[in-house]
Regions:
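Extracytoplasmic/surface-exposed domains of secreted proteins
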Residues: 1-2
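Ser/Thr/Pro/Gly-rich, low-complexity intrinsically disordered stalk/linker tracts of secreted
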Residues: 5-6
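Beta-strand-rich ligand- or partner-binding modules
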Residues: 9-299
Length: 299
């Protein structure tokens, strides 16, 4: 054998030493007349060529619906190498697998254009990895035993009937604040609600309020919800291609203030209030997102 990087033959051991042979895995016997060499083989990858690996669900997979997915592959991507991913899922109506792969970024949420599902049938979900390398010495690596996908189903519908009732309602997506009791002497006459939200075309955000005067003999639970008016950015929608286009929305009671009539008595102030936000959408993949809620009780 030649010395690495030269045309000179290896003529001898450059370092003084002995070869130790293991005996019964406990003692070592030296041999002064022998040495140990290794032959190391490596793969020779084709530069800039592509290789594909396709992963499918097994037949015992629980059925799930998906409006948003995130693939989580365990992979090693070294410098000058790359892995790109695509997915196929099953159509909700036709129960057939998508024809083409949709490009996704690993460990990043991807909002589907329409709801999809993974069924109990093997192959109702596919993820395809495309591996490339700019070096003949190295390749990206995928751990096939730790390749997973997270699916998120949005629970939302497009009805708002019975939402003014004291309790219940037909909308699925609702958020109700806890009951707020103002300090003695700080009774309010009006409410102002501010939301920072994404509202795509086809989706709506409705804000309701419920108030109770300290002089009212009814209980808070008996009071009905009242729909508020949107007073800024009315009917405006966020762009459909981004999840960062938030709108500043403001809501206030429909009348001059939040006074109400109960048992023929008009109450001009209130001590207790709560807010209910009702979200609806014609598509489960285009849902409102709210990241900030501010409620101001005005005297």
């Amino acid at each position: 054998e030649n010395i690495i990087g030269t045309n000179r033959k290896v003529s001898g051991q450059p370092y003084a030493g002995s070869l130790f042979k293991s005996q019964n895995a406990s003692t070592w016997t030296p041999n002064q007349n022998q040495d140990l060499t290794f032959v190391m083989n490596r793969a020779d990858y084709t530069i800039n060529a592509t290789a594909e690996a396709v992963f499918r669900n097994a037949s015992n997979t629980p059925e799930v619906k998906a409006d948003l997915v995130q693939i989580i592959p365990e992979e090693i991507v070294m410098n000058n190498t790359a892995i790109t991913w695509g997915i196929k899922m099953t159509d909700m109506a036709t129960t057939t697998l998508d024809t083409n792969y949709t490009n996704v970024t690993q460990k990043t949420n991807y909002k589907l254009p329409a709801q999809r599902r993974i069924t109990t049938t093997a192959g109702s979900y596919e993820s395809k990895a495309t591996l490339t390398s700019g070096s003949s010495h190295i390749s990206p690596v995928i751990d096939t035993a730790r390749n997973s996908v997270i699916t998120i189903e949005n629970l939302i519908n497009n009805v708002t009937t019975n939402e003014t009732n004291p309790e219940g309602g037909d909308a699925i997506a609702r958020y109700i604040t806890r009951r707020v009791n103002l300090k003695d002497g700080f009774d309010a006459t009006d409410l102002n609600v501010h939301l920072t939200a994404i509202r795509e075309a086809g989706s709506t955000i409705g804000v309701y309020y419920k108030v109770l005067s300290q002089y009212d003999t009814q209980t808070f639970d008996e009071k009905s919800w009242t729909l508020m008016n949107e007073i800024t950015n009315i009917n405006s929608v966020s762009g459909s291609d981004t999840e960062d286009e938030y709108l500043e929305l403001e809501f206030s009671p429909a009348g001059i203030n939040a006074n109400y009539i109960s048992n023929l008595v008009t109450y001009d102030s209130f001590k207790t209030f709560a807010i209910k936000i009702v979200m609806t959408s014609a598509s489960t993949t285009k849902v409102p997102l709210i990241k900030d809620l501010r409620v101001i009780a005005l005297a």
